[in-house]
Curated annotation (Swiss-Prot):
This is Calmodulin. One of its GO terms (molecular function) is calcium ion binding. This protein has four functional calcium-binding sites. Residues 8-43, 44-79, 81-116, 117-149 form the EF-hand domain. One of its GO terms (cellular component) is cilium. SMART domains: EFh. Ca(2+) 1 binds at residues 21, 23, 25, 27, 32. The keyword Disulfide bond does not apply. The modification N6,N6,N6-trimethyllysine is found at residue 116. Ca(2+) 3 binds at residues 94, 96, 98, 105. Ca(2+) 4 binds at residues 130, 132, 134, 136, 141. It comes from Trypanosoma brucei brucei. The lineage of its organism: Eukaryota, Discoba, Euglenozoa, Kinetoplastea, Metakinetoplastina.
Length: 149
């Protein structure tokens, strides 16, 4: 399944993997998964985290390595983001609930994920998704961006 991914997708997923793999040891533990999920406003229990890891942990190590992560991402892309997941993600980004994701909200989320972005990088991300040019991302623009990934 992971062999259907392009090199660009693999390198994007490698970047995402490093965000999760806080200590850089090449595996994602339940603790690391929990940290990332909490920074995104989720509050999973230890058992839920273990279930998530067990779902993709093919070698029974109790952690997720990069090949397992790729398989998970390929699977996720196949049953493509359901509308509910996209709505949920939009709500996480849209901190003040006004129906738009501003540069400040985007920067806040990315910083929580451990991504230190310059103002230029954040503005560039907004510009890429901002179809109507109002300087922020509305729900329709967000859906388009998520579907084109």
């Amino acid at each position: 399944m992971a062999d259907q991914l392009s090199n660009e997708q693999i390198s994007e997923f490698k970047e995402a993997f490093s965000l999760f793999d806080k200590d850089g040891d090449g595996t994602i533990t339940t603790k690391e998964l929990g940290t990332v999920m909490r920074s995104l406003g989720q509050n999973p229990t230890e058992a839920e985290l273990q279930d998530m890891i067990n779902e993709v942990d093919q070698d029974g190590s109790g952690t997720i390595d990069f090949p397992e992560f790729l398989t998970l991402m390929a699977r996720k892309m196949q049953d493509s983001d359901s509308e509910e997941e996209i709505k949920e993600a939009f709500r996480v980004f849209d901190k003040d609930g006004n129906g738009f994701i501003s540069a400040a909200e985007l920067r806040h989320i990315m910083t929580n994920l451990g991504e230190k972005l310059t103002d230029e990088e954040v503005d560039e991300m907004i510009r890429e998704a901002d179809v109507d040019g109002d300087g922020q991302i509305n729900y329709e623009e967000f859906v388009k961006m998520m579907m084109s990934k």
